[in-house]
Swiss-Prot record:
Function: Catalyzes the transfer of endogenously produced octanoic acid from octanoyl-acyl-carrier-protein onto the lipoyl domains of lipoate-dependent enzymes. Lipoyl-ACP can also act as a substrate although octanoyl-ACP is likely to be the physiological substrate.
Entry keyword annotation includes Aminoacyl-tRNA synthetase: no
Protein name: Octanoyltransferase
Gene encoding the protein: lipB
Every BPL/LPL catalytic domain range: 32-207
Sequence similarity: Belongs to the LipB family.
């Protein structure tokens, strides 16, 4: 019988394609009794092109690979120092619509940043989370058979310069930000637990369990 427990995997630094394949496999294999999972991971440098992605938004990738993804949205960059959180949730079971999940993820990041003194907000016209006009977190989701995968990417203490090689999320001149511009001692190690605590709170504090990678 299904129990409302979320399994949390802290996966460290991983290549994007291997984790993407694992997400697909998990989503394809899961059934109505499978636990929901949250994966916390950082990726080696990679540009990922979303389903709606247009090639003209990849300006000069250089030595960084470009990988096609089936998440929503346009091109973005992942690299070390960016906390990625993948949400593998049975939305039907949790009575969440897609828009509800987007709002929940944005609020997770807003609440996490508020705890460390950074005022952030979502934008109606461009998904993600912003500090002033600068984008600090990107979102991209896919829903299959009522279950979500992919998730969010929060810039913590990463090198932002690769974002200059693309139009982030399809917006020319979109300025990116990272947490260490306001909070110098931020690392993925001290941000990940806050991010997890905040998403669990918004999911009504289900029991959770860390699973060894």
């Amino acid at each position: 019988m299904y129990q409302d427990k979320i399994l949390v995997r802290q996966l460290g630094l991983q290549p994007y394609e291997a984790i993407s394949q694992a997400m697909h496999n998990f989503t394809d294999m899961r059934d109505e009794n499978s636990h929901d999972e949250i994966w916390l991971v950082e990726h080696y440098p990679v540009f990922t092109q979303g389903q709606a992605g247009k090639a003209e938004h990849i300006l000069m990738p250089g030595d960084i690979p470009v990988v096609q993804s089936d998440r929503g949205g346009q091109v973005t960059y992942h690299g070390p120092g960016q906390q990625v959180m993948y949400v593998l949730l049975n939305l039907k079971r949790r009575k969440l619509g897609v828009r509800d999940l987007v709002t929940l993820l944005e609020q997770t990041v807003v609440n996490t940043l508020a705890e460390i003194g950074i005022e952030a907000h979502p934008r109606a016209d461009a998904p993600g989370v912003y500090v002033g006009e600068k984008k600090i977190c990107s979102l991209g989701l896919r829903i299959r058979r009522g279950c979500s995968f992919h998730g969010l990417a929060l810039n913590v203490n990463m090198d932002l310069s690769p974002f200059l090689r693309i139009n982030p999320c399809g917006y020319a001149g979109m300025e990116m930000a990272k947490i260490t511009q306001w909070k110098e001692d931020a690392t993925t190690d001290n941000i990940a637990p806050r991010l997890l605590a905040n998403i669990l709170a918004l999911l009504n504090n289900p029991p959770y369990e860390y699973i060894a990678a």
